[in-house]
Swiss-Prot record:
Record lineage: Bacteria, Bacillati, Bacillota, Bacilli, Bacillales
Family annotation (Pfam families): Ribosomal_L21p
Gene: rplU
Name the record gives this protein: Large ribosomal subunit protein bL21
Keywords: Ribonucleoprotein, Ribosomal protein, RNA-binding, rRNA-binding
Organism: Bacillus cytotoxicus (strain DSM 22905 / CIP 110041 / 391-98 / NVH 391-98)
InterPro entries assigned to the protein according to its UniProt record, in alphabetical order: bL21-like, bL21-like_sf, Ribosomal_bL21, Ribosomal_bL21_CS
Family: Belongs to the bacterial ribosomal protein bL21 family.
Length: 102
């Protein structure tokens, strides 16, 4: 069984036991998170939400918080001696999906 959830402005396909990386949540490591915005549940009985599936939840355990690899943002204007170099590391939360309840 799998489900499509919405979190952090993104839609993510999840299955039980899967590790996922999502936008940072304000939750301590080791706690359990419940997602109520379940858009789709697939498997033997398919349920499509409009926009969400009523009564469906996905529970996951927070494994750790971290920051992604650094990306370099370099802005440049030709012939104007205008250069700006900036780095960015996006924070994330690593989850392990425990159960899909539909």
């Amino acid at each position: 069984m799998y489900a499509i959830i919405e979190t952090g402005g993104k839609q993510i396909k999840v299955e039980a036991g899967q590790e996922i990386y999502i936008e940072k949540l304000d939750v301590e490591a080791g706690e359990t998170v419940t997602f109520d915005k379940v858009l789709f549940v697939g498997g033997e009985n398919v349920k499509v939400g409009s926009p969400v599936v009523e009564g469906a939840t996905v529970t996951a355990k927070v494994e750790k918080h971290g920051r992604a690899k650094k990306i370099i943002v370099f802005k440049y204007k030709a012939k104007k001696n205008n250069r700006k170099k900036q780095g960015h590391r996006q924070p994330y939360t690593k989850l392990v999906v425990e159960a899909i309840n539909a």
